[in-house]
Amino acid sequence: MTRRPTTRLLVALLAAFSLVAAACGDDDDTEAGDGGSGSDGGEAVECTEDSQSGPAISIGAQDFGESAILAEIYEQALACAGFEAGIQTLGGFRDLLFGSFDSGDINLAPDYVASNLEFLNNFAGEATSDVDETLDKLTPLLEDKGLVALEPSEAVDTNAFVVTQETSDELGITTLSDLADKGQDLTLGAPPDCETNGFCIPGLQRVYDLDLSENFVPLDFGVIPASLDEGAIDVGVVGSTDGRLADPDTGWVLLEDDQQMLAADNVFPLASEELTGAYGDDLTTVLDGISAELTTDELTELNKRFDVDKEDADAIAESWLADHGIGGA
């Protein structure tokens, strides 16, 4: 079950953003971007010229488009609110993310609730489709590492199993149950951690009694689409908010998770306790406010602009912030 911020929380966050806007300077040159998804067409608030006193914020972005967009959204909103913030590009896997927190190279990053829990509990299968329940299990594990989970968004990005329209039509596959019945010999292309990820090969084995481990090809996220289109693999794992899923010309079929294997991978800001302790509500108001606005449909559209339309992450972030009345670049 996707967790939606309560009305009381939303009112508080909107009020907090009004205070941020009121505190901003008088620079009339700030312009809104030319549109994100599902927006109200608002303009970005003017940014403050005052600086927050405290440690610099280093935001970790993993090497895929969605992470780059989210990192830009965080960075631009924080910079507008007077924080010294920058982005550090990391590798594509969660062990590098946590290593960067441990070393102090980063102190903030966008991440995903269920995947974060399963990484820290050694893929014990504790994550559920209820984000509140999953977050309750995650919180003490983060505390042990000196980290804190801020408010998760409504936006969910979990694993998505896709085949080409041709494969779907030929074999009659539209669900993961169909894949288990008719696709045991198909080749699966996914990131290397699919072998241990509870929402990939182990999940297919546990929930669908489907073992594709012998037909598994480890691939970087970035090459999976081309590998699928070219026939090098038969089934590809992409993010459920992959922008190509919103493009009818892609020619993919998203296989329905009809037995609910996948869990609550809501996007949330992951921060060091040192960072939240230094800035308190000044920091969390900005980040929680972003989470209160972000939806799955919007994130999918933002990814389409990056992956299909080839827009830059910083421009995508700027227009999304403007559409939601949150200060940006």
Region locations from a protein language model:
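A bilobed periplasmic-binding-protein/Venus flytrap-type ligand-binding module shared by bacterial periplasmic
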Residues: 159-169, 265-279
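Short, low-complexity, disordered segments immediately C-terminal to signal peptides
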Residues: 14-15, 25-49, 53
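An extracytoplasmic/periplasmic, membrane-proximal ligand-sensing/linker region
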Residues: 54-56, 66, 207, 282-329
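A structural signal for short loop-to-beta-strand junctions that line the ligand-binding cleft
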Residues: 127, 138-160, 259
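Bilobed "Venus flytrap"/periplasmic-binding protein-like clamshell domains
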Residues: 54-91, 153-225, 230, 297, ...
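Sec-dependent bacterial lipoprotein signal peptides
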Residues: 1-21
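Acidic helix-start/capping segments at beta-turn-to-alpha-helix junctions
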Residues: 88-106, 113-118
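A ligand-binding cleft/hinge motif common to bilobed small-molecule-binding domains
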Residues: 113-125, 134-138, 227-254
